[in-house]
């Protein structure tokens, strides 16, 4: 108070002129403070006058000094979040959003996309105290900045609590302010700029793959760039660039030398402002360096949980050695260049070796100069790796006789032995990838018989495009690796005649598709051809420049391995890919073209009865077989009427094995095949596998009270002399604790787990559309089968219908409905069906009623959502629950 009184007395003694003078001094001081705040970072980025120039003749960028000490930020807590990325996009079809997703998919990172809410609900961020997302990405950072207060606070608190970072993109448009402060942040944006000469801040802590030793000379794509500016210590520039013209950025001053300053196009927020780490991009991902830094940003903000190791394995296959018309083959100088380039590449890739695939029939079929090239190549036989094609370069799927295929291979092997070519590499490639996928069984058997093949590769699994989805699998003891293209094909042999111009090839190499293939794949097998190594030798040009570019801009450790070791490394990294996923060959034209013409997709079933077990599936199987247009599978010698293909070891026998259970259709329009395997229902793998091979199939499931189903399974096991079922009562089985023996727990699971109906149907709904699935009332099927069969026929859409009221009759001795034959006789199921056994004890009934209560409630909700009628037993159960 005394101080305030003194101030009042002082003011009374000041003249108006003195007050104005003091105001002027205060304003001048404010201007100096503002100038320091605005320009401090920018001046810190200017190259020092005495800095030594780099190899490219450009002064190295100087990162700004932090004005405040670093404060502790919540560390990434990998154990507290799932390795899932939440991507907020403008729309499902926006280009930048798709590019972000493509990089995540290529890296095999799991993600979830959401339309960015301006207002409205935010996705659930936690589940039982665990964070659902390890990283948040905003296609448009303004959608994050302008979130309503509730959602913004919700998201920010989540990021702070779980150590989750944010990546955002700012894409200027014609309505963007030239200069503005990002709302709520000590960060200024200057937009709609043209930039050039991009460099990397070597002090940036997020750099991992990116090597900061180069300057990308030239104009950056687009004129809608945004640069970031701040004097707060939380911001660290990552990428820096100059303005294209000599004009200064508006509002940054008219200093004549200011245009030469470096401006941040990507900035890292260290989290010192609000505890959240972020990486902000001043444009989209069209600029290749943004893609590289984006990969590093994902790695840094997730504590390297979402990152690949720095090791990259590269194998370059040269297909069609000795194959090719005159004028496209290698001559003596080309062979020498191949050998010299291999040695040159070994300076960056230890023991790099070209892998040569040959068809011996075409040896010495070129010009004299090309034949001399063949001879020189064979004189270098020990310098390269070798693998066989077919002798006459024929497509294997055209050979239906395995012995003929083996004869062709034997001719190629004889040629190899005669010319000293090693035959024990264990790797082969089929011409045009024929027979590898879709699988031609004869090819796999002949490969093993003649060559002892252990590894092959293809670009066709699961599909040619998009390339980022290509995967590996193992079939019949042969490891199949994904193969990549590199922009070179049999017809691309001259640099100046490259499609789109030579600059297109350079673009693919220097930060383009080929560069990204290596960046985002730990293992890359590249397909090239003999013709790419003659004439302008584009194959050598491509890989020399690619390796140089990778060495200049990345910290990747380039390596190579022979094919068998490479395959072992691949499945060590991607062990989840060992099991194949068979698809309908007729759904992909390329697959159909390399699939045997003797095979037809019409042999696949159009209906699956999936179970679960002990609900009446065998009766339904019998009733469907009575329809003239419906045909069931042939019986299995092991599993009787059930094929059990999609859920177990039979799946690895392939689709040829599966099709053998169905006849070749006489009428593809009316013939309707179906199969019943009751253990498909609760299988974790069957829905996905079935949807891949039979995407248009109809699915039938029969449900009875899960308590009755559990008891029926227990009695079924007793009837088959299961020692565990004979030893323990039903009540002991279903109430067994976690310390019970493994065999007892296994029986308990088979009694109880299939009764989690909603859980299993949800899994099938994730693979098939709801209108492809029909859930039948098992109790009604037992009492009124004709009524149920009318529903089934309508669901299947069969052209002719059967009146089951006239074809079914109740057999009082059996106690269920049977097929009515001529003369009033009936054909019923075997002795094992309809077995009589004691009633379930009341304690077990009460236990199961309580055990399945929540499952049944979820089932009722799910069936309502699917638009299907609730089974009578479920309605009764829910009424009694109330």
UniProtKB/Swiss-Prot annotation:
One of its GO terms (cellular component) is Golgi apparatus. The gene is Ndst1. Residues 39-882 are lumenal. It comes from Mus musculus (Mouse). Its EC number is 3.5.1.-, 2.8.2.8. Widely expressed in adult and throughout development. It catalyses: N-acetyl-alpha-D-glucosaminyl-[heparan sulfate](n) + H2O = alpha-D-glucosaminyl-[heparan sulfate](n) + acetate; alpha-D-glucosaminyl-[heparan sulfate](n) + 3'-phosphoadenylyl sulfate = N-sulfo-alpha-D-glucosaminyl-[heparan sulfate](n) + adenosine 3',5'-bisphosphate + 2 H(+). Disruption phenotype: Mice survive until birth but are cyanotic and die neonatally in a condition resembling respiratory distress syndrome. In addition, a minor proportion of mice embryos die during the embryonic period. Mutant mice display cerebral hypoplasia and craniofacial defects, disturbed Ca(2+) kinetics in myotubes. They also display deficiencies L-selectin and chemokine-mediated neutrophil trafficking during inflammatory responses. This is Bifunctional heparan sulfate N-deacetylase/N-sulfotransferase 1. The active site is at residue 614. Essential bifunctional enzyme that catalyzes both the N-deacetylation and the N-sulfation of glucosamine (GlcNAc) of the glycosaminoglycan in heparan sulfate. Modifies the GlcNAc-GlcA disaccharide repeating sugar backbone to make N-sulfated heparosan, a prerequisite substrate for later modifications in heparin biosynthesis. Plays a role in determining the extent and pattern of sulfation of heparan sulfate. Participates in biosynthesis of heparan sulfate that can ultimately serve as L-selectin ligands, thereby playing a role in inflammatory response. Glycans are attached at residues 231, 351, 401, 667. The keyword Cell membrane does not apply. Monomer. Interacts with heparan sulfate co-polymerase subunits EXT1 and EXT2. Belongs to the sulfotransferase 1 family. NDST subfamily. Changing residue 486 to W: Loss of deacetylase activity. No effect on sulfotransferase activity. Inhibited by long N-sulfated sequences (more than 6 sugar residues) accumulating in its substrates heparan sulfate, and heparin.
